[in-house]
């Protein structure tokens, strides 16, 4: 008998919301979704600079809403200005990460090979791509 699949509803906030707006939006979502049906996961993916405030108490920390990142770099550390490692995301903590987004491919010319490296790094680090 096939296993029941979990449905994922993810909100990609893209490059929107300052710190206060991100916290307010997280609080509004938590208030609107005190319970999530079985077989469904809800995830929010704010900009990297907002991950910590959204993850805290008063954000999604004590709610059924999961936290995701919008991007990751596959190297563990190094001179990669502006990039975020898997370990950095785990410390927030992040459970999901968007990869292979059409905007990353179009604007930053990311390739299948790049996305494969990201996926492998995320899986090795315990984050769902």
What residues fall within each predicted segment?
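Active-site loop-to-helix "anion-binding N-cap" substructures in soluble metabolic enzymes
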Residues: 1-129
